[in-house]
Amino acid sequence: MSALTVAVAGVLATATAGGCAHTVGGTAQREEGSVPDPDRSYGYVDDRCGLLDDSTVQATLGADNVIRPYSGAVCQYILSRPGSVTVDVTFSWFDAGSLTREREVAAQRGAVLKDVVVERHQAFSARRDVTGAACSATAAAGTGVLSWWVQYRGQKTGDPCVDAVKLLTATLRSDM
């Protein structure tokens, strides 16, 4: 390698390093206001709620049995787990809903809120133990918001937010 090549390489390296040594103030912020799948529908289709069939809901929550007494804009489930534990679950999708609105309602009802990101979607969990350990996980999705609410009937212990987030994750991962 010639002395000229080494000198040019040295000057370029110094100029490049000097140009990159710039500090930017502030705090990085996540982009808000968009969802990864703005045109996707999460409504009740083909006997599935939130794109999940009953067996997927049952397997996701480790239940022995699942009953869906109501389906439509809102779907209700009653699951039984080993040890005589009954779990009440509700799915809802509001196609023109707002994550901000759902968050405000949860706060007004006294829920403990926690911001989360689920499958690249802005979301939050809302824990509110009134008639049993209960939690919802809600995300901006498609044109609106979807939510899974889980309550351990008659139980004051456990973390239903884990199960609500599992169902939300399964929904956001689903392909029609």
Label each region the model flagged.
Residues 29-48:
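Post-signal peptide N-terminal segment of mature Sec-exported envelope proteins
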Residues 1-19:
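Sec-dependent bacterial lipoprotein signal peptides
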Residues 62-127:
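Short, solvent-exposed recognition patches
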Residues 45-63:
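Amphipathic alpha-helical segments
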Residues 4-10, 32-37, 58-66, 146-149:
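Short, intrinsically disordered, charge-biased short linear motifs at domain edges
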Residues 109-176:
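A short, solvent-exposed beta-edge/loop patch
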Residues 18, 47, 73, 133, ...:
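Extracellular secreted precursors and ectodomains with disulfide-bonded cysteine-rich loops/domains
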